[in-house]
Structure formats: structure tokens, C-alpha cells
């Protein structure tokens, strides 16, 4: 149920991943989709990356790196802070994370239906790539509510356009 509140369609996945990239200080974000985002969503950024010991934690519900004390709640300066998005996305898809903080090797992590499949070191540039495949593969009832690929793709485009226009400092 919680995943459905955050992840209603491919456009909501793209929104959450782009907002994470913006919060990570990205200057450039690339968004790629296949079949309206139902088969594949790839969001790549050149932000700060995720520390290797935080990669698994990032996919836990209510886990966030954006709040470290109760006082942070009074001055939230990020787009996301609840720690719901990545857990919700991972729960209903197959996710691959590739991330590097810019020092040495990065980290590759795979999850399926929210369960860890593998984590290993990997060569990759600074930043993060999130690959989301087979959205709602394990919730067939949700698939019935998806519109045609073209309609889902148009919704993704609208989200990308809206975030790009509201953040002119970004290259999207």
C-alpha cells in the first residue's frame, strides 16, 4: 500500500529520482525510458553519489540522509526528506543502482521486489545511475490501471519538463 502512495505510475518514479538527483547537487541529469517507463527507466546524474555503506540503507523505508536532527525539520531545504521513495520504487520493480562519490571505485547494487540481490564494487563515474525495470512486475493488479505506453511516456515528459523549467541551473 505504501508503495502505491509514492509510485503510482512511471512519471512518479521519474519525479522522485530526479528530485533525489537535484538534492544530490547534480548539474546534469539524463532520463531515459522504454515503453512509457513500464519496461525501463534510467536516471543518471553527476551529483555527490552515495557512500558504499549507505547504498542498502537508502532503500529502507523512512531512511533519509537529509535529516540528521530534529532541528533539520524546521528548515528543510531539499525536495525529499521522508525516506519513502526508493523503498517504494524498489518494492514494485527490479532496481539497479550504480553510484560513486568520485573517489576510487563505486558501488553497484541490485534489488528485486525490494530484496537485495547483490552489492559489489564497480567502476563508474562520479554520480548516480538508477535503473528501474519491469515496474509493477510483482503487482499485476496495478498493471491494469496503466495507460498506453504513449500516454505514460507523455506524463514522464511532462514531469521532466516541469522539473527542468523550475531548475534552470540543470542540464536535462
Task: Give each language-model segment a name.
Residues 2-172:
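N-terminal phosphate-binding caps/lids of nucleotide- and nucleic-acid-binding domains
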Amino acid at each position: 500500500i505504501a508503495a502505491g502512495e509514492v509510485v503510482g505510475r512511471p512519471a512518479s518514479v521519474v519525479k522522485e529520482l530526479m528530485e533525489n538527483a537535484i538534492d544530490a547537487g547534480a548539474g546534469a541529469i539524463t532520463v531515459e525510458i522504454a515503453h512509457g517507463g513500464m519496461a525501463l527507466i534510467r536516471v543518471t546524474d553527476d551529483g555527490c553519489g552515495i557512500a558504499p555503506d549507505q547504498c542498502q540503507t537508502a532503500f529502507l523505508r523512512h531512511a533519509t540522509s537529509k535529516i540528521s536532527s530534529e532541528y533539520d525539520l524546521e528548515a528543510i531545504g531539499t525536495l525529499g526528506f521522508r525516506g519513502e521513495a526508493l523503498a517504494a520504487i524498489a518494492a514494485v520493480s527490479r532496481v539497479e543502482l550504480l553510484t560513486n562519490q568520485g573517489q576510487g571505485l563505486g558501488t553497484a547494487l541490485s534489488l528485486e521486489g525490494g530484496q537485495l540481490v547483490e552489492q559489489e564494487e564497480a567502476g563508474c563515474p562520479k554520480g548516480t545511475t538508477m535503473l528501474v525495470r519491469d515496474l509493477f512486475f510483482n503487482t499485476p493488479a496495478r498493471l491494469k490501471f496503466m495507460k498506453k505506453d504513449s500516454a505514460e511516456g507523455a506524463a514522464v515528459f511532462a514531469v521532466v519538463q516541469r522539473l527542468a523549467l523550475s531548475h534552470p541551473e540543470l542540464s536535462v
